[in-house]
Amino acid sequence: MDQKFPVKKVSLICAKGSIEDVYASLIMANGAVMEGIETNLFFTFFGMDAITKTRMDKLHTGVVGNPALRLPGGMRMPSLLGIIPGMEAFTSWMMKGQMAKLDIPPVSEFLDLITAGGGKIYACKTAADMFKLKKEDLSEHVSGILTIGEFYERAAGEGSQIIFT
């Protein structure tokens, strides 16, 4: 028997603040919104950088200890090179350049696309308290600062999925 169980709601949790981690969440959230799926995006811990006004468009790629890091063209970059001063900034600049060539929008614009399509963006109360962030420090796209329990209430329901990126 081949039954289909459609996804009706996607709730993503973004806990890391590197370019590749934040964009994984943004791309999946935007895709869900475009498919007409109810979408919640919850930022916690270092993922909060993606919704903090002063940091959201200044994310970096972690180079130290990243064994999957490749240069354009696919050449492997030894993680030991990450200790060279300026390597993280250079790698992040290259990554952003590649994304611009593919017309992938900056974080602030991505948040606009997601919310314009009906997606909801939330900040974690514990992380906001830890980092001493207030609602006014966050992007205008943030619908609220929630406890994890409040987020789970919004994430619940038949056909719901929670994805941790």
Regions found by a protein language model. Give the residues of each.
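A charged, amphipathic interaction segment
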Residues: 88-154
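Gly/Ser-rich helix-loop-strand patches that form or flank binding pockets
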Residues: 153-164
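N-terminal glycine-/serine-/threonine-rich phosphate-binding loop
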Residues: 1-21, 27-30
